[in-house]
Each structure stands twice: as structure tokens, then as C-alpha cells.
Amino acid sequence: MARVCQVTGKGPMVGNNVSHANNKTKRRFLPNLQNRRIFVESENRWVSLRLSNAGLRVIDKIGIDAVLVDMRARGEKV
């Protein structure tokens, strides 16, 4: 699935552009996705992930091993 964080599941949101005259038109708010290669010491290999900034913070907080266990439990291929 495109434009979705593999760690947090964050995807695009829908909202409005609001002009000075208060006219509203639909727009999409896209997550801040980055492609990152992260080294997993326990598996001695690199893992490529498409992450939002929040996903990077989750990895910093709980560690890549815990994140990979959670992703595999959801059935995501890593």
C-alpha cells in the first residue's frame, strides 16, 4: 500500500484548503514518509522500511527488534 507508514500505519488524511474568503476545497494531508535502511544487530542484516517521522521515534523509543516482532505479528513481511 502506498503512502502508509509500515510501523505506525499512518496514511493520508482528508481535509480542506481554506481561502481568505473562507472557500473550502478538498485536499489530502500526506504523512511525512522517509525510506530508511536500519541495521538489525540480532539478525545481522539491513532492513528497508518506509517510515513516518513518528515511526522513527517509535523505533528510537522501543527498539527495532520490538518493532519487527510487532510487524511480523501483524503479518507484514520484513
Curated annotation (Swiss-Prot):
GO terms for cellular component: cytosolic large ribosomal subunit. GO terms for biological process: translation. One of its GO terms (molecular function) is structural constituent of ribosome. Keywords: Ribonucleoprotein, Ribosomal protein. Gene3D superfamilies: Ribosomal protein L28/L24 (2.30.170.40). It comes from the Bacteria. It holds the Pfam family Ribosomal_L28. NCBIfam families: L28 (TIGR00009). Belongs to the bacterial ribosomal protein bL28 family. This is Large ribosomal subunit protein bL28. It comes from Herminiimonas arsenicoxydans.
